[in-house]
């Protein structure tokens, strides 16, 4: 079903936008039917205006540069125009369930997000979703709105993560408004247009499992297999193969997160993507000083989702997904043993998480240290570095970036990284072992530094950088949002003109707190 008739009413300067969006059509997920979703228009957003726009993401959708300047662009991506769409083309909120902070929360769902549809361009399909579009049947006690600060953070982090090479949802734009929204204080509303191949979560499978809807569970699994893992159809047990794909993509994602010091903050099962994307940017954080127990979410008082816990939590979440898939597993076995065999098969596949994650993280850490040749003792060298970093709260990003300056011959390049450690003697003891290890490498210092700088970013979205952009945006100055976005699109480049964005956080940054309140 094409949505083009519903937006063809756009006229004047917006006709180009209407033409560009003629490929917007009903998503394959929406075609699964009403048991999966509820259709409704977005809530009105008063006097919407553009805050941020990603030309890169627009290009994925086939949107030409300049369309964001059309007078009605903000009207469309605020959701305001959806009130004129026919009933069969209305946006939709999907229903799911899940475990939150380790506790079964029952039915959840898109409480403030609405799917617009799907765009196909250059052989790729992307779903569009408006986050902050108003109340839905799944909002529970929420108002369905997102606020400007959290919307800017999601926009910036979506783009930053993509350019770090980490699978993620993307962000097309942020639309702001002066419409008040009450949180701890009164803030203003905003809408982020998210873009992703799929927004299906572990929690979708948990929902239909918990409601004993095996028919819907099968339809959902078939949808994911058809769209993303068609090779699973050739397996002896296609649904077990789907679980295996989730194990692989989730393990790989955890390697990516841990390697850059990223902490998600709310790794509930309803915030886990079935296709291995980073999804639902809330109280996330890139750590500054290294702390293995770093907690980015002020609401996480027990540290369930601390940095060091993320791989373990990912495995736990996969266990919940496996449980949700159990009714579909083991169909190749005799009925009398099917249940037991399904559990055995699921446990075996889940065991692959550690086998995937641990070696991949070891390889990544060797790359971050510039160790091309694997040697016995490399793991110990990495672990001792983290111990010294933890004891000194040495900056995560700057430590790894500046290690590229260390020479295998002498201490002439040590200062930039050595100065990050209060206990210089402890660092010297480690770096001398590191230098000895580098002497076993065949690459020269220059070649090694180039390779290290390709995996150790100079620029990440530190909280204080986001906060500065947010404060200016609240004053209607959006230049810092776009400046920061541009810098984060080149995280591995030197960009000497932006050196201030790569430095240690200012003292005031230590007082910043992020929580689930957005």
From Swiss-Prot:
<keyword id="KW-0460">Magnesium</keyword>
<feature type="binding site">
    <location>
        <position position="111"/>
    </location>
    <ligand>
        <name>ATP</name>
    </ligand>
</feature>
<comment type="similarity">
    <text>Belongs to the SELO family.</text>
</comment>
<feature type="binding site">
    <location>
        <position position="131"/>
    </location>
    <ligand>
        <name>ATP</name>
    </ligand>
</feature>
<feature type="binding site">
    <location>
        <position position="194"/>
    </location>
    <ligand>
        <name>ATP</name>
    </ligand>
</feature>
<comment type="function">
    <text>Nucleotidyltransferase involved in the post-translational modification of proteins. It can catalyze the addition of adenosine monophosphate (AMP) or uridine monophosphate (UMP) to a protein, resulting in modifications known as AMPylation and UMPylation.</text>
</comment>
<dbReference type="GO" id="GO:0070733">
    <property type="term" value="F:AMPylase activity"/>
</dbReference>
<dbReference type="Pfam" id="PF02696">
    <property type="entry name" value="SelO"/>
</dbReference>
<feature type="binding site">
    <location>
        <position position="271"/>
    </location>
    <ligand>
        <name>Mg(2+)</name>
    </ligand>
</feature>
<feature type="binding site">
    <location>
        <position position="201"/>
    </location>
    <ligand>
        <name>ATP</name>
    </ligand>
</feature>
<keyword id="KW-0547">Nucleotide-binding</keyword>
<feature type="region of interest" description="Disordered">
    <location>
        <begin position="498"/>
        <end position="518"/>
    </location>
</feature>
<keyword id="KW-0479">Metal-binding</keyword>
<dbReference type="InterPro" id="IPR003846">
    <property type="entry name" value="SelO"/>
</dbReference>
<feature type="binding site">
    <location>
        <position position="144"/>
    </location>
    <ligand>
        <name>ATP</name>
    </ligand>
</feature>
<feature type="binding site">
    <location>
        <position position="109"/>
    </location>
    <ligand>
        <name>ATP</name>
    </ligand>
</feature>
<feature type="binding site">
    <location>
        <position position="112"/>
    </location>
    <ligand>
        <name>ATP</name>
    </ligand>
</feature>
<dbReference type="GO" id="GO:0005524">
    <property type="term" value="F:ATP binding"/>
</dbReference>
<feature type="binding site">
    <location>
        <position position="280"/>
    </location>
    <ligand>
        <name>ATP</name>
    </ligand>
</feature>
<dbReference type="GO" id="GO:0000287">
    <property type="term" value="F:magnesium ion binding"/>
</dbReference>
<keyword id="KW-0808">Transferase</keyword>
<keyword id="KW-0464">Manganese</keyword>
<feature type="binding site">
    <location>
        <position position="143"/>
    </location>
    <ligand>
        <name>ATP</name>
    </ligand>
</feature>
<protein>
    <recommendedName>
        <fullName>Protein nucleotidyltransferase YdiU</fullName>
        <ecNumber>2.7.7.-</ecNumber>
        <ecNumber>2.7.7.108</ecNumber>
    </recommendedName>
</protein>
<keyword id="KW-0067">ATP-binding</keyword>
<feature type="active site" description="Proton acceptor">
    <location>
        <position position="270"/>
    </location>
</feature>
<keyword id="KW-0548">Nucleotidyltransferase</keyword>
<feature type="binding site">
    <location>
        <position position="280"/>
    </location>
    <ligand>
        <name>Mg(2+)</name>
    </ligand>
</feature>
């Amino acid at each position: 079903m094409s949505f083009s008739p519903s937006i063809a009413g756009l006229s004047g300067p917006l006709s180009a936008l209407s033409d560009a969006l003629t490929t917007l059509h009903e998503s394959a997920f929406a075609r699964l039917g009403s048991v999966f979703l509820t259709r409704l228009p977005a809530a009105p957003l008063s006097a919407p205006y553009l805050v941020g726009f990603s030309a890169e993401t627009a290009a994925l959708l086939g949107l030409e540069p300049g369309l964001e300047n059309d007078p009605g662009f903000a009207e469309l991506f605020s959701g305001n125009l959806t009130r004129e769409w026919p009933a069969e083309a209305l946006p939709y909120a999907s229903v799911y369930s899940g475990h939150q902070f380790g506790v079964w929360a029952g039915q959840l769902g898109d409480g403030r997000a609405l799917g617009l549809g799907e765009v196909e361009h250059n052989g790729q399909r992307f779903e569009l979703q408006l986050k902050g579009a108003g109340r839905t049947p799944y909002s529970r006690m929420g108002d369905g709105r997102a606020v400007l600060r959290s919307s800017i953070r999601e926009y910036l982090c979506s783009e930053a993560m993509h350019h770090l090479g980490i699978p993620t949802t993307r962000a097309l734009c942020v639309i702001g408004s002066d419409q008040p929204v009450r949180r701890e204080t009164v803030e203003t509303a905003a809408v982020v247009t998210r873009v992703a191949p799929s927004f299906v979560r572990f929690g979708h499978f948990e929902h239909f499992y918990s409601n004993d809807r095996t028919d819907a569970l099968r339809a959902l699994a078939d949808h994911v297999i058809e769209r993303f893992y068609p090779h699973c159809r050739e397996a002896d047990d296609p649904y077990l193969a789907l679980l295996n794909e989730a194990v692989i993509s989730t393990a790989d994602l955890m390697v990516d997160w841990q390697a850059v010091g990223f902490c998600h903050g709310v790794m509930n099962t309803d915030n886990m993507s079935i296709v291995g994307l980073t999804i639902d940017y809330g109280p996330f954080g890139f750590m500054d000083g290294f702390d293995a127990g770093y907690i980015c979410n002020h609401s996480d008082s027990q540290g369930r989702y601390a940095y060091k816990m993320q791989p373990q939590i990912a495995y736990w979440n996969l266990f919940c997904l496996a449980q949700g898939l159990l009714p579909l597993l083991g169909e190749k076995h005799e009925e009398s043993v099917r249940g037991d065999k399904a559990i055995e098969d699921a446990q075996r596949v889940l065991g692959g998480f550690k086998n995937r994650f641990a070696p991949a993280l070891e390889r990544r850490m060797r790359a971050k240290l510039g160790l091309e040749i694997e040697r016995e003792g490399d793991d110990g060298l990495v672990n001792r570095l983290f111990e010294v970093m933890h004891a000194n709260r040495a900056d995560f990003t700057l430590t790894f970036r500046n290690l590229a300056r260390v020479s295998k011959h002498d201490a002439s390049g040590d200062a930039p990284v050595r100065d990050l450690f209060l206990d210089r003697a402890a660092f010297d003891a480690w770096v001398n072992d590191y230098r000895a290890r580098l002497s076993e490498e065949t690459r020269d210092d220059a070649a090694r530094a180039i390779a290290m700088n390709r995996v150790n970013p100079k620029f990440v979205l530190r909280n204080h950088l986001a906060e500065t952009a947010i404060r200016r945006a609240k004053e209607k100055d959006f230049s810092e949002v776009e400046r920061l976005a541009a810098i984060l699109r080149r995280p591995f480049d030197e960009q000497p003109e932006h050196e201030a964005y790569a430095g240690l956080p200012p003292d005031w940054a230590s007082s910043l707190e992020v929580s689930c309140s957005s």
